[in-house]
């Protein structure tokens, strides 16, 4: 590495010495050499002698002019162009060259298949031209694109199309104008040949907006669901938040080579094709719902992210936490609120809590960053959304919406901070959030311990609630947080007991603000069964000594669907922890009859929503289970999880088969009732696959071959792989033969291969690096094969001999120079070495030291490796 990357600190923020009000861009496009001309209107705000320091990387400078005169008062440094002796107001003209085809990092302007496209968030615009690449510089963009018409018939950018024309030699040009000032991370350009799905949306004020969805030629029949999702998003944002779209056109382009999921560029969203393309035979129910969610997320950014952006990147959760909350609400309003909440909580418990306990622990508003791309995290996004949800819980929907309106009134068209958002919520609601603000600055997962006491003589029930947040890699000292803690109390017949104190009703959301607090409730005539942390009202770990009877009672009687699922999770957690300890001592699995009976009751409950039943019957993932332990034993977890599956499969075989047969559907519809039935049926098939082999093999093979949709086909294939059924290899080969030319569909196959419990899985993964459908230059392929192996097959990745670690080192060595952003995502399982036993830690540390010694180690990897080794 040439020099050690330097950290940036939130407290060092200062406004820029110069602002750019308008920028006129011209691109003379060619994959090998593109000429960029940037004409900026600049104004000095700093000291008269302050130089203009522009960001730029991998650029070839051609010329600089100030007010049309050639300018020589400048110098180039690594990553910067410093221009001196400037007047207070001036026009700056910079011409430079770039090579999109050589840009394998996929930041800035790059080649995706035969198309050219951009990705500028967080700091990609500096790979296009020299500029003030920071989010607090908002300018109006005009963009002219010139290109060969046969290669690039469509030339797209932000805003509205204002002019176009033909040129000699088969070339043409299009000019775009975006009337809304924006930071350069929201700039976008796409050039290519596409099929286009067109539609319109009429806003509530009566404006007609043109909707255009661009997909690769031949994929038009996979675009309609994305268009439906976009129109639903636009309607929902008007109805729920009162927010209307503001341009004449809204475009989405699907590209195959993309580091992230999607990007909210103003008026021109660029999407990973994974979150656009869907057809019954290529996409699962989950794919359809993910497309709906991500289309919604990027559309909702038009107001929460674009119209109001971030002052600096430390404030990223201002737009992302808020917009994830909005997309979660969108999915919940359109679908099943309980199932969506369960999905969000699985992510928090299985993945975000692990991030809090890792060397990369940070608050939702980080204080220190080396590489900004490393902070597009579950903490900033998902925990950030939980913080917004807590504000919503404390204020209520009406006051929350008043806060949103005030936030837009104050900050529309500007760059704001997290404090600005909280202040707007406070001022609109008159609710004091000063203590609550600690959620923005304190990292880690709070542990809330609850003890209860019932006094039959006074008919009082008391909860003693204490909180502590363990020290994290970035913060040793922790303070008590303001935790909204939702509860319900049930009598022995399953009725909710009204909460009272001193003759007055008590809010079911308790405000826990101290290290320890006591809450007493009157007129409780029987020992109640408590439902605690209802709806996961705060992102905390809960400690309470549940009895099995309490949990099975809640599974049956809780009026809140989330509480029913959560009780099942707690019941499973009890016996998973017990059996991991037994496994480590060489003892067999132990599961009391009443646990299986509790799950049998779910299967026999005719009133339960099938989607909820499926969630209750889905065992926690290996990653969720890992969070139950201080020291993770991945092999014991995998073996106990499989033994538990086989035990339930044997105990409930008749019920699983009956429910499986009862939920057959002839037609495929993306309908929440049908999705629930398919999910339940496939959850049953998963258990049946671990039952009697001959029946399992027959059922799975038949479902795979009879399936008229990808959901059922993939569920069968996944069951065959998980249970290692005799039909596995034949079915996997059939899938490969049918779909090998479709990368997105093959990603599902690569994930099944790389997460297989087979002993030779690493050997298989190594072999698949040479598969005809695999490419080390495509992030989706890399994530589905290498990423899934390292992140979702812990038993194989953490093999005792260290072979999994060595494999990842080899892959990261390649990706370090090819695509540092993707490399940085893949290293996550390796940096969490302190959660494992000494022998594994030693091997993981050696692997990290090996990577640290790489020549030209990227800043992305350097930051994570040095924190892990600290």
Residue ranges of model-derived segments:
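Hydrophobic alpha-helical and helix-loop surface patches within well-folded domains
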Residues: 176, 204-458, 462-463
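Long, ordered, helix-rich scaffold segments
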Residues: 350, 377, 522-870
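Extended, low-hydrophobicity, Ser/Thr/Pro/Gly-biased non-transmembrane segments
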Residues: 95-198, 561-564
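Surface-exposed beta-strand/loop patches in extracellular or lumenal glycoproteins
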Residues: 37-58, 130-133, 139-148, 419, ...
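Short, hydrophobic/aromatic-enriched beta-strand segments in well-ordered soluble domains
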Residues: 37-42, 56, 88-103, 141-149, ...
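A surface-exposed beta-strand-loop module
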Residues: 45-112, 133, 168-170, 174, ...
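N-terminal, polar/Ser/Thr-rich
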Residues: 1-35, 110-119, 131, 135, ...
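Beta-strand-rich binding/interaction modules
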Residues: 60-67, 432-435, 445-532, 577, ...
